[in-house]
Structure formats: structure tokens, C-alpha cells
Amino acid sequence: MQGSMTASEIAKIVREEGLYAYASCSLLEDHLYSSVYSNWNAGYRVEKNGVLTGDQWYDYFPDQGGQPWLDPNSDLTVAYLQNIIKELSSSGFSAVLCSDIKYPNFVQADEKYLNPDIYAKNPDALIKLANALNAAASDATDIVLDLSAYNAMNGGELVYDPSKLDVSYALLETSSGDASSVSSWASSNSGDMSVSLSYTDGSGNGHCVINY
């Protein structure tokens, strides 16, 4: 379903209720933008023997539901996502929660078709993208990395490196059962970042946030 209200109109209504307007964006797991031919360079490109073939990479066979993803190494991807942040920021949103700043789950066969640096999931490209998004936001809009606490604790959130990030805020999503261990980890692994822990209240209905 597609609505007709603009981002500015939505943010205005939220603010008029005395609330903060937060936007939530899934970034690199975007299957639409790079599916348009003119935007193919925003997605992963097939490479053989160091030469781009002109074909696009999909996370499975295209005729069986495979989808393209945005490549954080692409200048077109960075510009596209920066423009989204700029629009939300200028529309009056207090914060943008950015999720899915990650690589796809590459399989061994992909090693033959992707640049070695991409197949190795170089975290620097993700961190550079996060910093570019932070730079695109106005001073009135916070960029918040919306991450899986479990993945962050186990090295799966490659973008999460407080020593290299210009982003000041992160939100770690977890369950109430893991909240204690995540809390202990977050308190000593946040660097200069302000980290919040978000989890359901046990019934699956509530939403609790603890800030560090």
C-alpha cells in the first residue's frame, strides 16, 4: 500500500502530538533501486578474472526469487542513500534508525563472481557508508545504527566499530532473556558512542530501552 502523505507532513503530525519523529530505513537490503537498469551500478556486479561482465549479482537464481542488493562500495549507492537521509532530515525527523548496513550472506560459489574484497566482506566500506550518512544529516537529526545485539557481540555487525565511526548513536535489538548479557557487553564496547538497548518486556508486547 502506498500513502500520499509526504515525509514532511508525517513528521509535522508527530511533532504536533508532542512526540519525536523517528524514521526507520532498511538500507543495503534494498531490492528495488538497483533492479532498474540505469541504476545497476548501485548493485553488486559480476566479475570474472578481474573484469566486470555487465551482469548483476543476485542473492539466488533470479527466476526463483533471487534479488539484487545495494553495494556499499558503489558511489551511486552512497549518493542514493545520502539523498534519502537528506530528505528525511530536511523533513523534520529527529532521528533516522538505519538498519541492514550489511553484506548479503554470500555462498562459496559467489567467490567466482565477485570482487575478492567484496566477497571477503570488507567492513571499511560499511563504516565509510555509515559515516557518509551521518555527514548528510543536519545537526537536528541523529543517525542511529539499528543493529542486532547478538550479531554485534559475535562480530556479525561489521559496521559496528566505535573507534572508526563518526556516528554517535547505536540501538542494539535483543530479547529480554539476553538483556543482562548484552547490557554487560554494551557497557564496555561502546567507545564514545551512546548505545541504547531495546528489548521486549517478556510478553512480546512492550518495548523497553536502556541507554548507556
Tell me what each language-model feature is:
Residues 110-124:
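Glycine-rich tight-turn/loop motif centered on a GG-T
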Residues 28-86:
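Active-site-adjacent "subsite" loops/lids of carbohydrate-active enzymes
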Residues 167-212:
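Substrate-binding cleft of secreted/luminal carbohydrate-active enzymes
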Residues 9-27, 85:
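Substrate-binding cleft of carbohydrate-active enzyme catalytic domains
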Residues 7-11, 85-86, 123-134, 179-187:
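Generic structural signal for well-ordered alpha-helices
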Residues 1-4:
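Aromatic-lined carbohydrate-binding/catalytic grooves of carbohydrate-active enzymes
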Residues 69-73, 77-110:
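Active-site groove signature of glycoside hydrolases
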Residues 20-29, 97-100, 120-158, 171-173, ...:
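Aromatic-lined carbohydrate-recognition surfaces of secreted/lumenal glycan-active proteins
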